[in-house]
Amino acid sequence: MAPPPSSTSIQVESIVFPPSVKPPGATTTLFLGGAGVRGMEIQGNFVKFTGIGVYLEDKAIPSLAVKWKGKTAAELTDSVQFYRDIVTGPFEKFSQVTMILPLTGKQYSEKVSEMCIGVWKAQGTYTDADTATIEKFLEVFKDENFLPGSSILFTTSPTGSLTISFSKDGNIPEAATVVLENRKLAQTVIESVIGEHGVSPEAKQSLASRLSDFMTQFDEKATANVESQIGL
C-alpha cells in the first residue's frame, strides 16, 4: 500500500478544501490533488462561478508515477494523456464543486448532460442505456438549489459507479444521494473538470504541480526504503 502523500489544504476564494476527505461512496480517505476556480469572461470581467477540488486515492501516486514521475508541473499541465490517465486510472476519485455564485440543480445538470451526450455522440458510443442514466442524473438535480457555499459532490469508483451527494453547509455528508452505475458518465464527469477541455484550468495546473511533487516524494521514499533494507 502506498504511503499517503503529505497533502495540504487549498483556499479558493473563501472556500477551503481540506487536505483529505472520506466522501460517500469511497472505501478510504482520499487526499487533495488540486483545486481551482471555474469562471468565464463576461463583458470583459472574469466572473467566478465555483471552486472545484479534486481528491484521489493514495495509490494514484504509484500508479501515475510509473509513467509520469520526473516530469515538471509544466510538462504535466501540457499533457492531455496525463489527465486522461487520472480519469481512467484504477483508483478512487472525488470532485467537490462548491458554489461561489448561486446555481439551480436544473441549470447544472442540463449543462453537464449536454456535455456528456455531445462527447458520447462524437465518439459514437451513445446508447439507450446512456439515455436512461442521463434521465436519472437530471432527476436527482431537478429540485435542488445551490446557494453560495453549498456543494455538489461526485465520487468515482474504479468499477464505474458514480456516487452523487449534496452539501448545503460545507461539510461532507456521510450518506450518498444516489449511486449511478455507468462508467462513461463517471469518467466524463471528472474529465469535464480536468480533461482536455476541462472547465477549470486553475484546478488542472494545481493538480499537475502537486502531483509532480507527490511523485517525487514517493520516489524518494521508495529509494530510502530500499536503501534501509539493504543496509546502505
Swiss-Prot record:
Substrate binds at T50, S192. Keywords: Flavonoid biosynthesis, Isomerase. It is an enzyme of class 5 (isomerase). It comes from the Eukaryota. The record marks Y108 as: Important for catalytic activity. Disulfide bonds: none annotated. Pathway: Secondary metabolite biosynthesis; flavonoid biosynthesis. Its EC number is 5.5.1.6. SUPFAM superfamilies: Chalcone isomerase. One of its GO terms (molecular function) is chalcone isomerase activity. Transmembrane segments: none annotated. The keyword Cytoplasm does not apply. It catalyses: a chalcone = a flavanone. GO terms for biological process: flavonoid biosynthetic process. Part of the biosynthetic pathway for all classes of flavonoids, a large class of secondary plant metabolites, many of which are brightly colored. Belongs to the chalcone isomerase family. This is Chalcone--flavanone isomerase. Catalyzes the intramolecular cyclization of bicyclic chalcones into tricyclic (S)-flavanones. Responsible for the isomerization of 4,2',4',6'-tetrahydroxychalcone (also termed chalcone) into naringenin.
